[in-house]
């Protein structure tokens, strides 16, 4: 058995300090709040009374929780070295809200992703959302960051379309210990981040030198399409450039826990060029990993009728914002959108197109290997 360092956490005036293995954030993590409590149990694994239930996550990990306040909440200026932060909150899933995140909040979360865990990078995991076909997590700015791993439950019918989704996790048809008994894990996208977080905590414990970028690459290679999503025709397509299957709702597919260890060893034995970035109109990368665009848009009629697509020089077309029929706002808006283009060459013409509106401002970057 691999030994691990035990970390402790102290909350001082509502600010998290110290260095635990993981952190769960939710709108309300007071004692007795089931949503946050179940997420904390899922990421901590099968320990104590939880071992009596059918969920068998790897244990045991020290997990703290943090109640989110207003959107101007900031990470401490000296970011704690969390290995994983599981975030099961976000934009309201009503198909009408549009959340753009700017300023200090985005900057501090970005710094944690880059500098956490002594510079290796903290893994921030977010759910795609529960809005189903009436919503699109492209409108949830909290998911739109290159350092964030967005996930959902495979074949979850209320999962929002989202070009930012990297991978999915198996449906949680298991029970977890809560409120003095074993109860079924709620089937929602909120359950996906802590389930994936538990897998990644085990991976990091076995391979503590893995960086955030390495973990993202491992996840892509450890994922595969699954039959339950109808991968032989229902939305899955094969990228002939990268030879990878992808899906608008499910990213690169469902993570196989057994493949994580195999791909981790492969990644650690591979000499890889450092990450590079370029503006999208002059992208000179040999392998693009992520593309980020920030757009200002004026709707022709309603904001919910606006769709945005990005096409690569290789001809891959990805919808980064879909129709949201309950969003009747007529106001101009700004949004930031990210999507993975794992392994495609960046040289050539990138095109961002919009229907149902007019693009007023455009700024984009590509990130990957030069």
From Swiss-Prot:
Is Hydrolase found in the keyword set?
yes
- GO function terms (MF aspect): serine-type endopeptidase activity
Which residues carry out catalysis?
A: 13, 35, 190
**What EC numbers are recorded for this enzyme?**
3.4.21.-
- One Pfam family of this protein, by short name? P_proprotein
Q: Which PROSITE patterns match?
A: P_HOMO_B, SUBTILASE
Q: Which Gene3D superfamilies match?
A: Galactose-binding domain-like (2.60.120.260), Peptidase S8/S53 domain (3.40.50.200)
- Its signal peptide is 1-17
Sorted alphabetically, the keyword list is: Hydrolase, Protease, Serine protease, Signal
What Gene Ontology cellular component terms go with this record? membrane
Q: Which PANTHER family match?
A: NEUROENDOCRINE CONVERTASE 1, PROPROTEIN CONVERTASE SUBTILISIN/KEXIN-RELATED
Q: What is this protein called?
A: Subtilisin-like protease
Q: Which organism is it from?
A: Ictalurid herpesvirus 1 (strain Auburn) (IcHV-1)
């Amino acid at each position: 058995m691999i030994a691990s360092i035990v970390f402790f956490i102290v909350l001082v005036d509502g600010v998290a300090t110290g260095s635990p293995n993981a952190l769960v954030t939710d709108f309300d993590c007071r004692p007795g709040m089931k949503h946050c409590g179940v997420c904390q149990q899922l990421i901590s694994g099968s320990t104590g009374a939880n071992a009596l239930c059918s969920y068998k996550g790897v244990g045991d990990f020290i997990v703290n929780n943090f109640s989110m306040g207003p959107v101007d909440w900031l990470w401490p200026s000296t970011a704690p070295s969390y290995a994983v932060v599981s975030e099961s909150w976000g934009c309201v899933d009503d198909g009408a809200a549009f959340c753009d995140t700017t300023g200090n909040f985005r900057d501090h979360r970005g710094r944690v992703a880059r500098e956490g865990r002594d510079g290796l990078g903290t893994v921030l995991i977010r759910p795609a959302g529960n809005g189903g076909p009436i919503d699109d997590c492209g409108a949830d700015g909290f998911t739109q960051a290159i350092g964030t791993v967005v996930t959902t439950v495979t074949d979850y019918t209320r999962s929002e379309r989202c070009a930012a989704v990297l991978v999915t996790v198996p449906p949680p048809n298991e029970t977890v210990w809560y409120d003095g008994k074993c109860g079924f894990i709620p089937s929602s996208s909120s359950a996906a981040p802590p389930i994936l977080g538990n897998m990644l905590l085990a991976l990091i414990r076995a391979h503590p030198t893995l960086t955030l970028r390495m973990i993202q690459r491992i996840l892509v290679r450890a994922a595969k399409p699954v039959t339950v999503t109808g991968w032989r025709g229902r939305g899955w397509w094969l990228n002939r450039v990268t030879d990878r299957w992808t899906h608008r709702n499910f990213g690169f597919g469902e993570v196989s826990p057994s493949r994580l260890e195999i791909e981790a060893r492969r990644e650690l034995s591979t000499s890889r060029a450092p990450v590079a970035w370029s503006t999208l109109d002059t992208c000179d990368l040999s392998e693009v990993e992520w593309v980020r665009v920030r757009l200002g848009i004026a709707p022709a009629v309603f904001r919910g009728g606006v769709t945005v697509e990005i096409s690569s020089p290789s001809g891959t077309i990805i919808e980064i914002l879909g129709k949201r029929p309950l969003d009747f706002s007529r106001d101009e808006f700004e949004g930031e959108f990210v999507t993975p283009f794992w392994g495609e060459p960046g040289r050539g013409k990138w095109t961002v197109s919009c229907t149902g509106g007019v693009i007023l401002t455009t700024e984009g970057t590509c990130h990957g290997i030069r």
